[in-house]
Structure formats: structure tokens, C-alpha cells
Amino acid sequence: MFGKQKNYSAWLLIAAIAAALWLPNLFALGMFIDGIVDAILAQSLYLHIGSFWEPKSQAISWSWGTMPLSIYLLSLFYKILGDHFWVERVYSFLCALLQLGLIYQLWKTLFAYEEAIKKQAWLPCLLWIICPLTGWCYGNNMMENTMTLFTTSAIIASLSFIRTQKNILLSSFLVALFLLLAFITKGPVVLFVFALPALFIGMNENFNWQLALKFSFLQIFSFFLLAVSLFSIPEANNFLHHYFEEQIKPSLGNSSPTDGARYSILLLLTITIFPFVLMSAIRFGINKKTLPNEKMYWRFLLLGLCGSLPIMISNKQRQFYLLPAMVPFVIGFAIYLLPLIDWLNEKIKESWQQKIIPVIKYGSIATILLCMVLCFTQAGTFVRDNDLLSDLQRVNTLTKNETAICADDIFFEQWSLKDYLLRLYRKRVCMSNENVKTPFYFTLPNQTGEHLPAGSKKIMAGKTLDLYQTPQ
């Protein structure tokens, strides 16, 4: 479909898909709750509430269960761009673009001496961006977006040494540094990259098990030294202690806030990579020839499994935890699909290629331009939680500069309402037992509420809540 000299059309297609995934909603409202919470903590840091090692917000005294690096990086964007609701989307969009660049560089590093394959760097980038998990994560401000930048950088640094056998100390230090940065972004799930040297023994004739063992030792030792140096800082050590107690122990124990079957990650992984498996089955049906790089294909698939299967240790099973592991998966599947690209180039006549390529080229350009227009015409619209966000806009108008609103106890677990109100309007929802003076009160629609003060007047009837003004 793409001639050897026409790879630019593939890059245009990738740009068009990226534009379609993220530009129309770049300035829209609505996000998965984890992304909102992370944005609240970053916003609080920007407002000088809490610190790097002591994250908290107006509504949360401390948030020890969240590693701080991505929060800190996002807070820098608030300092640069201002406290706007779209800043976290811009940050995630830039992470997505950087991630595409890193996948491109990973492929170039892997096939540095194979010019024909190196030119197909668009293929893993295309697989990455058409993966539904990718579009969802970068559209919802997930911490995995930042973490994946660091784990991919660590993979590149490790492969660079395996390819050249030069600068083993520098390469080991870089791998360790990137993994430490990934660790303080999301936690220990990043450590799967340490498996890479063992999996790539024999990648070339000079990289034997002795050198792999030495390289692994230097990586782990460097990581240990860097981690000990960092967490010997009292504030960092205090954070790590609380993180272990509030995040690691519950997730490894018998209960956690997001309990699920320990093996559900296998189903989630199957769902995530199913499109690639289907494409691989088509490729196998068309061309059963043995891959020249078959061992490389299996190495990357095993590395992807190293990043996925250990999640079974935890009670917490979420599909977006798989994002860092998807990088080796897309590289592996791209290697397997290379013969399919060659087959398409052979079977599709040059005359047809000359017709198809302009369609892709100009269709992609048109898509990008359309998405740029939608980026602004869709600004301020809702992409999820429409009724709730619409109600909260009215609440903000009616409560003006009020920073707290009292509510029935039933609202205690209305996390989306509380988090949206805090993130978008800096207003905190307080329960009836809190000693907070505020002239406003939430109840469920068409209900008087358990603790609504006598004489209160309903000033807004919404779809998700009613707002009362209480007597002063």
C-alpha cells in the first residue's frame, strides 16, 4: 500500500489519526476520574498547596498513594500556561507526540544497520496510535503517559548498548536514571525493563550471557545507588514510607479500593492486543514464510509480557496499567507484520499505488485541517458526564466566589462531582458534620436532604443535584 519511496504518506496518515484522536477534544470538558484527581494535585502544587514529596489539595490533607513526578511536571504547565481546564489535555497531547518520537527512535536504534527495515519506522508508530488504549489514556491525563516516556527511553538506552557494546557504564546509568524517573511517576511496575538484557542474549554475536549478566548487574546496581541517594532525603523517605503503607501493602493484600480478580489483567491484555493478533493472523494466512527477525519478534513479545503479567501480583487490575508494556508489544507485532507490507507492495500494482497514495495524502491533510477547526469549535463542550458538568457550570455561576458548599452525607462518595467542582472551580464539597460556614447546600434532585437547614430556599433544580441557599 505504501511504496518504498512513499513512506511520507504513512506519516501523514499517522498525523491524521493523532489529530482525530486528540485535537477535537483538546479544549473540551470531561475526563476519567483518575485524570481529574492528578490534575487537582498538580493544580494544588501550582497554587503552593502541598509540596513535591507531600502532595495534597484543598479537599485532601495528604495524597500518599500517588507518586509525585508527573504531578510536578503538570504543575509546571500550569505555571507556563495558566490555570485553565485544558492544560492537562495539552500536557497529555505533548506526551503522546513525544511518545511517537521515542517509538520512532527505538525502531531506528533496533535496526540501525538494516536500512530497508529502518525506513519502516512508521509501522510501529501506526500500530501504537491505532491501539484503542493509547487514544483513551492520552485523552484522560493518565500518569502512565509520563511513565511510558521514561520506560521507553530506558529501553532505547539498553538497546543502544546491546547494539554497539560501547559505553556500558553510561548506558547502565541512563537506564537506571530513566527507570528511577519512571518509578517516582507511577511505582514499581516500571522495573520490567531490567529483563531486557536477559531476553536479548544473542541479539548479535558479541552480546553473550556473560555480557548480559554484567550489563544487568550494572543497571540494577546503578538504580539501587540512585534510589538510595534519592530516598535518603528525609522528605522523600517519609513519602516512600507512606506510599508503601497506603498503596503497596493494600494492593498486595486481600483488599484494596479497586479489588478485582487477580487474573483479570490477562483478559484486559487479550482485549488490548487483539487488533494486533488479528492483523498477525491475516499476515500468517497470506505469508507463512519464516521471519528473518523472528527471534527479535519473540524477544519483544516476552518483554511486553514482563511488563504485563506481574500486575497479577496486585489486587488492582486496570487496563491502562498496560500502557508501558504496549511499546514492546507494538515493536514485536510491527516486526511480524513487515512481510505483509512487502506483500502489499508486490501485489498492488504501481499504477494503483499512484492512485491510492494521493488519496491517503490529501485525505490525511483534510482530516488534520478539519480536526484543527473542531479543536476550537468544540471548545467548552462536554465529552462525558454532560448532565453533571452542565449542573456544575450553573452552580459556579450561582455561588460566585464561595469556596465551599455543604452537602448531604450521600454525596460523600460522589467523587466525580467533588473532583470536577474542585478542579474546575476551586470549590470544595463539605459534609454536614464539618464545621464549615457556607450559605449553600447540595441535595439529590427533588429531595429535601437529611440535614438541610430550615428555611433554605431552592435556587437551582438540576439533573444530578439541587442547590439550596441557606438562611444566614
What function would you assign to each model-found segment?
Residues 20, 38-62, 69-72:
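Extracytosolic helix-loop segments that constitute the early lumenal/periplasmic catalytic or substrate-binding loops
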Residues 108-118, 154-172, 337:
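Membrane-interface transmembrane helices that cradle and orient dolichyl/undecaprenyl
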Residues 178-181, 185, 190-293, 308-315:
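Transmembrane-lumen/periplasm boundary regions of multi-pass, lipid-linked membrane glycan transferases
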Residues 316-352:
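Hydrophobic/aromatic-rich transmembrane helices and adjacent perimembrane loops
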